[in-house]
């Protein structure tokens, strides 16, 4: 049909005449399979991912599905240079090559649309797992955005208790808070969380964010930001206090 992609491979003899020509034939088919694998990845992968999203996750709206698609493509292209993703990239390509070589053992022509849809079940299953991962990442990002929006609201509805808070990383990643006169105010800031602190293990990152929200300073100065072990914490503070950090 007009929507199908046909690629026909013709070999002069049905079977190689001798061992040398058999070796040449195998090399030829390997080159053909490699070229077709690259073509399938380049021309089908994004369409297949989009189809999986639209079929399996139709309850997301069109904007959300586009966002999930972009996350899935980022994962599949390994833009984050993740080692495991690199291995999965190689695995997916090898699945396609293996299936093509199996197919060419009994045929020298194929319609790519049919081949992709009916012969590459393992490959499509891998893509479905990537989409599932992209959906999880999307939901986590959405949850994070909603969380940040809520924290920003808490900051906006209260009057600043201090003009400036200086944040310094202390011993064992504890945070020291200073006011505009460089006087330590750490104890004052954490006073209302003292019961929670005495009850169990302390998460100093959460304690810092909670303290800053409670004090709602007009300006936050982060000293030696390179010493902050949790880089996401820095982003959270910047997002909750836009224009103040």
Placement of each model-derived feature along the sequence:
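Conserved mixed alpha/beta catalytic, RNA-binding, or beta-rich assembly cores of soluble enzyme
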Residues: 1-206
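C-terminal structured domains
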Residues: 180-245
